[in-house]
Amino acid sequence: MMLEPSIDKLLDQVDSKYSLVVLEAKRAHELRDKERPTKEFKAVKRTLQALEEIADGTVKIHPAPELKRETLVEKRELERLQAKMKEQLIKEQIAKEEAEEEAKQKNSRAAKAAAAE
């Protein structure tokens, strides 16, 4: 039984078996943590999915791990700020709707008071 992707095809994408194992493990963890896949998979297991991506060349070892780490930190910070801004917009919309509702109620009470006189 031939395993797909083959070890030869995989080793064409990385420098060594060690690098392959490390890349596979890291990518499998990313996929488990809901990182966006780069393709449709034949395999069900995350480790085999990672190997499929490596064989296709869509996942590579980052040349500067520190830079990748910084990029991830920046990405997470940006996502956090975007979520905070979205939350703030929702709060502002709620406050605006509450103010409009309060104004309608005031106008309604004023109209009733004027009609009663």
Swiss-Prot record:
Name the record gives this protein: DNA-directed RNA polymerase subunit omega
Transferase recorded as keyword: yes
GO CC, one annotated term: DNA-directed RNA polymerase complex
Origin species: Lactococcus lactis subsp. cremoris (strain MG1363)
Coiled coil location: none
Keywords, sorted A to Z: DNA-directed RNA polymerase, Nucleotidyltransferase, Transcription, Transferase
InterPro entries in the cross-refs: DNA-dir_RNA_pol_omega (IPR003716), Pol_omega/Rpo6/RPB6 (IPR006110), RPB6/omega-like_sf (IPR036161)
Biased amino acid composition, Low complexity: 108-117
A Pfam family that the UniProt record links to this protein: RNA_pol_Rpb6
Main EC class the enzyme belongs to: transferase
EC number(s) reported in the record: 2.7.7.6
Basic and acidic residues bias: start-end ranges: 96-105
Subunit structure: The RNAP catalytic core consists of 2 alpha, 1 beta, 1 beta' and 1 omega subunit. When a sigma factor is associated with the core the holoenzyme is formed, which can initiate transcription.
Transmembrane found in the keyword field: no
Functional description taken from the UniProt entry: Promotes RNA polymerase assembly. Latches the N- and C-terminal regions of the beta' subunit thereby facilitating its interaction with the beta and alpha subunits.
Family of this protein: Belongs to the RNA polymerase subunit omega family.
Gene3D superfamilies attached to this UniProt entry: 3.90.940.10
Region of interest called Disordered, as start-end residue ranges on this chain: 96-117
Listed GO biological process terms: DNA-templated transcription
Reaction equation(s) it catalyzes: RNA(n) + a ribonucleoside 5'-triphosphate = RNA(n+1) + diphosphate
Molecular function (Gene Ontology), one example: DNA binding
